[in-house]
């Protein structure tokens, strides 16, 4: 199937020109169907079998799995098709027009991370994929930037068990083998309103929340003291109070107070255990004020992730790149892929470009990224 694809830069241009924004706000959220159609056509042209998978619980979002080869094992290359929304007033270029300037390619998704699929396609354009000795899978997921619904659903429903996977998130080609998780909760306190001239006739939700926050801070200190992973720049689980709102007037007893908080657990800490620790921390308040305090998820939680440092994937990639793997504090889809096979996070561009105005790919990443994909496909699918 040689040379059936457009040139690399035109593939990149087409990906950036196809909007696929994910947002919790319905007015900003977009389907990724057009982008999936583009990718499905190109991978079909290369000889892959292509399956498009609707993702339940989303607004018309899809995963795409392109596969070739038979048998067990093989390699999975994966990434997400969606981008974050953009702030029109802060971009100096059209986010959906690939712009080349000063050794950079500008556009929404150039770094995070639609452009990774252009690298995969370009690396495979001259490969007869029907002759690979082990399977090669390409997965394009939906909604990573909001719920990670695509990766969650794929990992829960697929029977595939590749030998290993690489997620092409922007890491400046520094291989990542572990990251923290993310839990985002809302704590709600329901009081009883009344006139401020007689506080005893009501229940002040702000005062109850003040008590709850004291117990949450004790949990924060306990997490810091009990759990450590020295490879991380912040080597303990973090707990952050991000948003609070309560009451509506200075002369009313506050009837409702709401606190948004997050916890970033280390690899190996289970989500159930953390939820249990939070509930235990708040138990004294709940017992003192029955039925007035609740805890709920703001977003579906993401567990921490770790690829075994002695796995063949780590050894091969470290040798190819001449560098050691690292760990990071941010989250990716790796915990879900790791349930299928050992997984690394590794791709072009810097994470510092993600979610920024005038997002860009430095062209110095083009050649080494193409070479890396070619080498890992050769190692894991030809041998």
From Swiss-Prot:
Cofactors required: Zn(2+); Co(2+); glutathione
Enzyme Commission number, as recorded: 3.5.1.16
Active site positions: 82, 144
Keyword field: Amino-acid biosynthesis, Arginine biosynthesis, Cobalt, Cytoplasm, Hydrolase, Metal-binding, Zinc
GO biological process: L-arginine biosynthetic process
The keyword Iron is annotated on this UniProt entry: no
Binding, Zn(2+) 2: 112, 145, 355
One GO cellular component term: cytoplasm
Alphabetical list of InterPro entries matching this protein: AcOrn-deacetyl, ArgE/DapE_CS, Bact_exopeptidase_dim_dom, Peptidase_M20, Peptidase_M20_dimer, Peptidase_M20A
Family classification: Belongs to the peptidase M20A family. ArgE subfamily.
Subunit and partners: Homodimer.
The protein's name in its UniProt record: Acetylornithine deacetylase
Originating species: Salmonella typhi
Gene: argE
């Amino acid at each position: 199937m040689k040379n059936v694809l457009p040139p690399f830069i035109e593939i990149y241009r087409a990906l950036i020109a196809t909007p696929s924004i994910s947002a919790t706000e319905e007015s900003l959220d977009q389907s990724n169907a057009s982008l999936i159609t583009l990718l499905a056509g190109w991978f079909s042209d290369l000889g892959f079998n292509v399956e498009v998978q609707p993702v339940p619980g989303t607004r018309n979002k899809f995963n795409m799995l392109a596969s070739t080869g038979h048998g067990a094992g093989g390699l999975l290359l994966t990434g997400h098709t969606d981008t974050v929304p953009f702030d029109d007033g802060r971009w100096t270029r059209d986010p959906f027009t690939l712009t080349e300037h000063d050794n950079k390619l500008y556009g929404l998704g150039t770094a995070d991370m639609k452009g990774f699929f252009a690298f995969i396609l370009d690396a495979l354009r001259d490969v007869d994929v029907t002759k690979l000795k082990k399977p090669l899978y390409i997965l394009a997921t939906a909604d990573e930037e909001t719920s990670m619904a695509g990766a969650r659903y794929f990992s829960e429903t697929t029977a595939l068990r590749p030998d290993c996977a690489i997620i092409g998130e922007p890491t400046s080609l520094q291989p990542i083998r572990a990251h923290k998780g993310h839990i985002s909760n809302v704590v709600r306190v329901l009081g009883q309103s009344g006139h401020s001239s007689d506080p005893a006739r009501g229940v002040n939700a702000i005062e109850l929340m003040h008590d709850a926050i004291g117990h949450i801070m004790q949990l924060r200190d306990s997490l810091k003291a009990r759990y450590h992973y020295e490879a991380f720049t912040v080597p303990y689980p973090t707990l952050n109070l991000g948003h609070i709102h309560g009451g509506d007037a200075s002369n009313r007893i506050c009837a409702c107070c709401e606190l948004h908080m997050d916890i970033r657990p280390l690899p190996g800490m289970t989500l159930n255990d953390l939820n249990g620790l939070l509930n235990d921390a708040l138990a004294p308040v709940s017992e003192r004020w029955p039925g007035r305090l609740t805890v709920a998820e703001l977003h579906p939680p993401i567990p921490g992730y770790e690829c075994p440092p002695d796995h063949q994937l780590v050894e091969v990639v470290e040798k190819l790149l001449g560098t050691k793997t690292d760990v990071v504090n941010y989250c990716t889809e790796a915990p879900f892929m790791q349930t299928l096979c050992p997984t690394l996070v590794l791709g072009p561009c810097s994470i510092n470009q993600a979610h920024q105005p005038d997002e860009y790919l430095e062209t110095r990443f083009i050649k080494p990224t193409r070479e890396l994909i070619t080498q890992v496909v050769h190692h894991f699918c030809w041998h």
